[in-house]
């Protein structure tokens, strides 16, 4: 089972014994006349929290101070949960969704429709679509979208395994559910041409503006998008 590759963030060196200067933190951590703003351990914690998506300097500071107030056992449980998830969660060998087993629960479920595959770019999209309770088929996670500017071509995505799955006689339809950004549209059109010789290819109808993200759509919008899918 392939593991999700995540680079471990390296701690930056201490500037001095009195202060830790974190380049990515937007607020000053420099030494003041009567002492430092943060101790080095707290500064390191704030910096690491700020690496998380959508977490800015103030949010990172608030989270760090909140964690310091919690009981040791609670903080240890959080740290252990993070380590366990990092160590155990990888990719499903079939659909490339997140899984702690070689094959994920969705792919193993006996009541899922094996004849329909919904193609998404990211595991978060699987979670969003599952919350609608409308789709009963299987999924395929590409691991991104075609983006030449970022050096991401078809070879960097899980397109070859998708072609292998679609070539099976039992597959009757492939639904392309990729967020409608410029890169998403490029990926959708590319896959449409690639998959049409094998099976019926449809794309979901979006109630989203161009450039919107699938994961942020509400459940009703996603459900209607699935119902209103059209053939490419």
From Swiss-Prot:
SUPFAM superfamilies: Recombination protein RecR
Annotated PROSITE patterns: RECR, TOPRIM
Keywords: DNA damage, DNA recombination, DNA repair, Metal-binding, Zinc, Zinc-finger
InterPro entries reported in the protein's UniProt record: DNA_Rcmb_RecR, Rcmb_RecR, Rcmb_RecR_Znf, TOPRIM_dom, TOPRIM_RecR
Zinc finger (C4-type): 92-107
Xref: Pfam families: RecR_C, RecR_HhH, RecR_ZnF, Toprim_4
Source species, domain of life: Bacteria
Gene Ontology biological-process annotations: double-strand break repair; recombinational repair
Any one GO MF annotation of this record: DNA binding
Residue intervals of the Toprim domain: 115-209
HAMAP family membership: RecR
Family membership: Belongs to the RecR family.
NCBIfam families xref list: recR
Task performed by this protein: May play a role in DNA repair. It seems to be involved in an RecBC-independent recombinational process of DNA repair. It may act with RecF and RecO.
Stated name of the protein: Recombination protein RecR
